[in-house]
Amino acid sequence: MPFTLGQRWISDTESELGLGTVVALDARMVTLLFPASGENRLYARNDSPITRVMFNSGDVVTSHEGWQLKVDEIQQENGLLIYTGTRLDTLEENISLREVFLDSKLTFNKPQDRLFAGQIDRMDRFALRFRARKYQSEQFKLAESGLRGIRASLIPHQLHIANEVGKRYAPRVLLADEVGLGKTIEAGMIIHQQLLAGRAERVLVIVPDSLQHQWLVEMLRRFNLRFALFDDSRYIEARHDSDNPFETEQLVLCSLDFARRNKQRFEHMLEASWDLMVVDEAHHLVWSEDAPSREYQVVEQLAEQIPSVLLLTATPEQLGQESHFARLRLLDPNRFHDYQTFIDEQQKYRPVADAVTLLLSGEQLNNNQLNLMGELISEQNIEPLLKAANSNSGESETARRELISMLMDRHGTSRILFRNTRNGVKGFPHRELHQIKLPLPSQYQTAIKVSDIMGAKKSLEARAWDMLYPEQIYQEFEGENATWWNFDPRVEWLLGFLMANRHEKVLVICAKATTALQLEQVLREREGIRGAVFHEGLSLIERDRAAAYFASEEEGAQVLLCSEIGSEGRNFQFANQLVMFDLPFNPDLLEQRIGRLDRIGQSRDIQISVPYLENTAQAVLIRWYHEGLDAFEHTCPTGRTIYDHYYEALLNYLAKPNNQDQEKFGEFIDQCRQQHEQLKQQLEQGRDRLLEMNSNGGEHGLRLAEKISEYDNDTELVNFSLNLFDIVGINQEDRNDNMIVLTPSDHMLVPDFPGLPKDGCTITFDREQSLSREDAQFISWEHPIIRNGLDLILSGDTGSCAVSLLKNKALPVGTLLVELIYVVEAQAPKRLQLTRFLPPTPLRILMDLKGNNLADQVEFESFNRQLNAVNRHTASKLVNAVQKEVHAILQQAEGLVETQAKSLIEQAEQEADENLAAELSRLEALKTVNPNIRDDELEAIEANRQQLLLNLNQASWRLDAIRLVVVTHQ
């Protein structure tokens, strides 16, 4: 095409320069000025990477003054274009705009505009865009959204609870599973689901001081949720950025003490518009009708303001009924307003539980029992079900399950209280204790005597604490560099134990970080034993590295030495050898130590070795834990109660281990054991088995775990992810253990890829491997790297237009095919979850010049494999040659896509209407027999249904990508 001064062109390789103007010409070169960027470029007249900008009738163009013109007619005058049409701001007709006066900041957003402007993308990017649309659409519609991407084992009861609660509007529930069953993971899954679904955006997590780090780690490692830890300094720092510091972050974690201590701070917290609050260890909130504690009042006021509340607590049997009622009162004060009414109501549910037990037994039901069933489910005709349940046919089991489901719906608190026990959940290992009694070295004996004399004024508690850790006493007198490890027999025993168990991974836990560091040095220097250290002084990344070093099978550490605080929130199920170098002060910490290995998914029995020094507080404590509480070999739900009750007596025995009457101490142990047995029996009798059945999920939980497990083997995810990393420009380094190291490169599509750390990260597509390797992130469709990658591709114009060659001798050379990808979508607030029914859905059309749609006959992937790439310059020439034909095809395609899109929208409307109407009528029917269904929940479902149908009715479609395919024989 001949050049003329004033013509407008665009650079094929530097589209960010905007619209260029021809300002100089000679026989061989042409100069373009790009006013938007102030740049000049010199190009050869022949074969330059620039494209003439020519708009068509129907296009809207912008003048350099800012007004817009809808083009009706195009004329040429001396090689320059004049656009004539209607000015959109004044509606004047027959207004002319010369191309030289077009806005230089012009960008091409529509795929067809980019194609005609020569901004043609690579073929592989077009394919990636289509796949991204397809996969994203499929993921939105899956019912298990929010559960599939968690970095945790697929435990049925956890999945059931998370699925049941996570999909509710403003859930307010009590999670009261026994220790070790994963309440934190359940809460994390619910948070994850609520965030992904858009039901929550701002989350507040309140935990005890000692659990802050554990929560921070669990939320980040398992759910990729980056909480901001608020303490005094963070609060003060955030005040510089906002009047309300809590509004500077969406996900906030803090301690209960932090929330309680300062009135203004608490007011800021109340005003911060949270969507969801989680309170861990909620059983420590002290309440009585006359005098609720300050901590209880803090949580109560927050719970009144925040729509969704999760309380994590001990089991109801451990709490006692009054304390249990206090937690339920936080969730729904209108429903649980009077304690005695609550007790009376609970008694009424006894027949329901008995009926379920009867159905589960499989025995024939007598007339009295049949009448009882009829009374309990009085609003429905269940005669046919009762007959089937009592028959010997194959329908009996199905009928009994349906009756059980109906009875469960009537159970008072099963909708707001979830509680599982180890008895009801299978998969836990046995625990074996090995006590290693060792002599007390003379050096320690001397140090303890001196400490007794000098510490006479110390409190009983302080002296008891000192006596538990003789190496600390020794260092106090001999200095920090005193080499206690040279004579402490526990060190010799540990060396021998590790040498004898060379092929075992061993977790060693001690109270202090200094002890762990000193032991690692001794093991390394004396026997060359590879060890990693894990303590509170390390950063998250350093802890990850230590954990990964310990987890590695080849060249990994044999032993991981942890301090008490440093081990919080980390689990090492791949190991089964636990050494307690010393003992913690209370039963909760003891269970926490064992819980590092004793988790669901542990495949071997846990071996607990405790080397202890005779005639010391350690000897007292090991006997009390083992003989008094049976706390080593079994979980001890009574531990805290007995500890609190006998606290003073226990302190006396610990503070003076040498001066005790052995007979009296034996009686003390017997007393503790008897109380332990009595409490345990009371707990067992108080178990609500109906509640356990509902919390466990049964078959539903198992099916959910199996279904998610099937997604774990998704090869499409692996192929798509690697393709995405290639095109985005992320470096990939394959490791020989099914892991990949991702690092940013200098040529990425964006300078900072969201979700990818600057120093890179290690990923795996294998769930089990991610669980055994602390440093490996588990990649799923829900991982931020993949979700951000999808958003990056689909929110921009990457791959929105391309040109390819099809080598096919069965078709004439030059045959033109146009592949069009339309997207049908509707806009709605995220909380409505419109994408469950109509996600942005791609519609593919493959047109020939005769107006035939070949998409059904020619599948995308097989077609794509037959195509060859073409360079951008040649592609621009091909586009210019067939521009007229492409416009005609686009017009024909509009009619085709309209029919398909309307059908899709109607389907979505019908599905949404039926789905939400069914949910509403189910809950309305239940409300007649179960008062725990809240009115606001019913109102929200109906309001959502109306709003969803309105939004779906306004759904539209648009062209998202276009590809020209030209047939060649070469």
UniProtKB/Swiss-Prot annotation:
Residues involved in ATP binding: 177-184
Residues of the Helicase ATP-binding domain: 164-334
Gene3D superfamilies per UniProt: 2.30.30.140, 2.30.30.930, 3.30.360.80, 6.10.140.1500, 6.10.140.2230, P-loop containing nucleotide triphosphate hydrolases, Tandem AAA-ATPase domain
Matches recorded under CDD domains: DEXDc_RapA, SF2_C_SNF
Keywords tagged on the record: Activator, ATP-binding, DNA-binding, Helicase, Hydrolase, Nucleotide-binding, Transcription, Transcription regulation
GO molecular function, one term: ATP binding
Enzyme class: hydrolase
Motif (DEAH box): 280-283
Coiled coil: none
This enzyme's EC code(s): 3.6.4.-
Protein name per its UniProtKB record: RNA polymerase-associated protein RapA
Organism expressing this protein natively: Photorhabdus laumondii subsp. laumondii (strain DSM 15139 / CIP 105565 / TT01) (Photorhabdus luminescens subsp. laumondii)
Record gene name: rapA
